UniProtKB/Swiss-Prot annotation:
This is Cycloviolin-D. There is a cross-link at G1-N30 (Cyclopeptide (Gly-Asn)). This is a cyclic peptide. It holds the Pfam family Cyclotide. It comes from Leonia cymosa. InterPro entries: Cyclotide, Cyclotide_bracelet_CS, Cyclotide_sf. The presence of a 'disulfide through disulfide knot' structurally defines this protein as a knottin. The keyword Disulfide bond applies. Belongs to the cyclotide family. Bracelet subfamily. Probably participates in a plant defense mechanism. Has anti-HIV activity. The keyword ATP-binding does not apply. GO terms for biological process: defense response. Keywords: Disulfide bond, Knottin, Plant defense.
């Protein structure tokens, strides 16, 4: 539920490496 400060409109979340995932075009973690 915390935003990772990254969007995922055109590319995947680079922050997925630290547990972030794409939701509503923004990367979130928990």
């Amino acid at each position: 539920g915390f935003p990772c400060g990254e969007s995922c409109v055109f590319i995947p979340c680079i922050s997925a490496a630290i547990g972030c995932s794409c939701k509503n075009k923004v990367c979130y973690r928990n």
